[in-house]
Swiss-Prot record:
Alphabetized CDD domains for the sequence: KH-II_30S_S3
GO biological process annotation, one example: translation
Superkingdom, taxonomy of origin: Bacteria
UniProt GO molecular function: mRNA binding; rRNA binding; structural constituent of ribosome
Assembly behavior: Part of the 30S ribosomal subunit. Forms a tight complex with proteins S10 and S14.
Protein name: Small ribosomal subunit protein uS3
Length: 221
């Protein structure tokens, strides 16, 4: 099971949190969900060069808070905050709600699976050999503190007639262990031979559940 399912979805509610934090009744749920998808697609398309790792959306009454996790906050914010203000106005026009945009910097993009996948995809588009791109990326991630990494490239690799999947991995990636903090990312490279899919799994170590504090008057000195 752990081999097939999205590692993030499998761990939601255990060691990972939801990307969208809001509640809605039956009438509004589908509309808000579609709105979330549109917001994410718009931001990703507009700011692809900024290295967007993930987008969190929180809702309260008629307000929407969008947290953008990016490797290059300078591109998102712009000179004097002009870019982020323009983005906020576009989102307000799209949703007809009050929008607050929060920028969160990704300190180590080398161990962020989504950014790693997008980096490999951009290298493939520049005609860099897929094995070289995979190997260099794995070594860089392990140097920056990843416990293990696994990469899969699928498609007409090196312009081959028949599509295939090539794997490269180092370290350990325990997909079945629910307390294992595994990041997952997916990107597509648009080459002259067609699309090449890139999947990345990065193991960052185990997340241990917090120890329960003793009740008042018990176990304390």
């Amino acid at each position: 099971m752990g081999q097939k399912v999205n590692p993030k979805g499998l761990r939601v509610g255990i060691i990972k949190d939801w990307e969208g934090k809001w509640f809605a009744d039956k009438r509004n749920y589908s509309n808000l969900l579609i709105e979330d998808v549109k917001i994410r697609e718009y931001i990703k398309r507009k700011l692809y060069q900024a290295g967007i790792s993930r987008i969190q959306i929180e809702r309260a009454a008629n307000r929407v808070k969008v947290s953008i996790h990016t490797a290059k906050p300078g591109i998102v914010i712009g000179r004097g905050g002009a870019e982020v203000e323009a983005l906020r106005k576009e989102l307000e026009k799209m949703t007809a709600k009050q929008v607050h945009v929060n920028i969160v910097e990704v300190k180590t993009p080398e161990v962020d699976a989504q950014l790693v996948a997008e980096n490999i995809a951009s290298q493939l588009e520049k005609r860099i050999a897929f094995r070289r791109a995979m190997k260099q990326t794995v070594q860089r991630s392990l140097r920056m503190g990843a416990k293990g990494i696994k990469i899969a490239c699928s498609g007409r690799l090196a312009g081959a007639e028949i599509a295939r999947t090539e794997w490269y991995s180092e370290g350990k990636v325990p997909l079945h262990t629910l307390r294992a903090d595994i990041d997952y990312g997916f990107a597509e490279a648009n080459t002259t031979y067609g699309k090449i899919g890139v999947k990345v799994w990065i193991y960052k170590g185990e997340v241990l559940p917090e120890a329960k504090k003793p009740a008042a008057g018990q176990g304390g000195e």
